């Protein structure tokens, strides 16, 4: 089973055209491990996306900050939003993210709200 780099569809082969979008299944050549983790933030399998957010935070990947912020703000999965927020805090620290955390401290998501409030306390 192989995931399409462009649309995340499951494909029977690691190369060639995607069964859904017809784009190439494989990603661009030379992607770094960090780039693949950033890609995985959009993965439809929530566990993979959460693991990617946690790993990006643990690795301190600053280039992932915009993607992590999007994952929080899109709020398509509350567990991903929390993992992405924690990852962003681990990378940049609460001082650098203070204004954003202040906004998130009033989020509709109680999970995001709690993490943001703890970070600025």
Description of each model-found segment:
Residues 1, 28-40, 61-74, 93-106:
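Amphipathic alpha-helical scaffolding segments comprising HEAT/armadillo-like alpha-solenoid repeats
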Residues 1, 8-13:
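Short, flexible, mixed-charge glycine/proline-rich loop motifs
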Residues 4-7, 18-21:
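Short cysteine-rich clusters marking metal-coordination/redox-active sites
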Residues 25-29, 56, 60, 88-93, ...:
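Alpha-solenoid repeat junctions
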Residues 36-61:
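Alpha-helical segment of the N-proximal tetratricopeptide repeat
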Residues 44-45, 76-77, 108-109:
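Short inter-helical turns and helix N-cap capping residues of alpha-solenoid HEAT/ARM repeat scaffolds
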């Amino acid at each position: 089973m192989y995931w399409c780099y462009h649309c995340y569809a499951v494909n029977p082969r690691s190369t060639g055209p995607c069964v859904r979008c017809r784009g190439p299944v494989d990603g661009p050549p030379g992607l770094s491990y960090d780039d693949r983790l950033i890609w995985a933030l959009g993965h439809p399998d929530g566990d993979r996306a959460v693991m990617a957010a946690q790993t990006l935070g643990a690795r301190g990947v600053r280039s992932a900050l915009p993607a992590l912020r999007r994952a929080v703000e899109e709020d398509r999965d509350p567990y991903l939003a929390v993992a992405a927020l924690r990852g962003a805090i681990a990378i940049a620290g609460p001082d650098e993210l203070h204004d954003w955390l202040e906004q998130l401290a009033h989020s509709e998501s109680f999970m995001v709200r709690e993490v943001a409030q703890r970070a600025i306390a």
